[in-house]
């Protein structure tokens, strides 16, 4: 497979862009080789600068639930373009978008549009702190909430009460206000809350984690978090940037039946355009400026092009509940075929999945938090990634990222993926 053009672009990029990429995982550091530079996409396919074509399972890291080049979304964008790229003023589209989100997600009574998932989570934490008058937050090891300082914290062994900076540039003072617990460990949460009585403003969690691979909440875990937050006057925030509108018309909270106080959103709500949102109870959200004292603003927030794309996809999803059944069935079919291929080789690797999100972990133990996810054989994953790539299948270049199925993945394409998987597994296991 030729990649001379991509290699040349990467060489040029490294001279002017840190690491040659605008988001670290794209650099292929975890899997070796040079990243592929993509020039176009259609349906379930990516095409790189050397004209290699790949069936892809990352959906632009989640947003492209209908596949690439969807005419419904592209028409909405084309129509909006005739009115200007940006107004810097309120527009009809942002009102319609907010009304639609509120109608689809029962826990959200008011919503504010921003430009990214990171902005959404940073803003939600600020609002929770302002609303409660408390400063500390609890997050979960392995959950990713964007690159805000408060979230770049990881707990070392046994460090359940004090965060440590996980990136140079994160002040120790910020780290001190971010407490971490293992995902799915409700007792660790109870201990943190008890040791920091009346100091916790918010608990933020991915209700389905996607950035340590796909990791699901244990039965009763989300319900227990809800109970703790109710008892201790803590704002429960679900980060549904990845799972929102991906797992159901109301996201993971619709699947698991637990309502948070606040929700952050992104990815799918922009239909591929850069966008984010945060919302929740009116009692909380009415504290956001200009109706309240908690400041948050953005020049391009509510951008009419992004709103038009988002409206198109959300209206379609709301009107097409059968799509989720289709996506779930196709994901089940794909995983069944992949697992069968593994079994024929005597392999028992762990699959985690819910809806159209899934990960195959290169370990045979159950994966339910970051520590168990890290038991995966990363060298085997890297070899698998390259073997699949050579067969025209583009995966996330990290063991610790969820894969996604779009509606563009037909049974025929799923069979191609299963065949490539079987060949790749045989190759890397000799």
UniProtKB/Swiss-Prot annotation:
Claim: Transmembrane is one of the keywords in the record: no
GO cellular component: a single term: cytoplasm
Positions bearing N6-(pyridoxal phosphate)lysine: 267
Gene Ontology biological-process annotations: protoporphyrinogen IX biosynthetic process
UniProt cross-references to SUPFAM superfamilies, sorted A to Z: PLP-dependent transferases
Record keyword Protein biosynthesis present: no
Biological or metabolic pathway of the protein: Porphyrin-containing compound metabolism; protoporphyrin-IX biosynthesis; 5-aminolevulinate from L-glutamyl-tRNA(Glu): step 2/2
Alphabetically ordered keywords of this record: Cytoplasm, Isomerase, Porphyrin biosynthesis, Pyridoxal phosphate
Main localization (coarse): cytoplasm
Stored InterPro entries: 4pyrrol_synth_GluAld_NH2Trfase, Aminotrans_3, Aminotrans_3_PPA_site, PyrdxlP-dep_Trfase, PyrdxlP-dep_Trfase_major, PyrdxlP-dep_Trfase_small
GO molecular function, one term: pyridoxal phosphate binding
Localisation per UniProt entry: Cytoplasm
Subunit structure: Homodimer.
NCBIfam families linked: hemL (TIGR00713), PRK00062.1 (NF000818)
Protein name (database record): Glutamate-1-semialdehyde 2,1-aminomutase
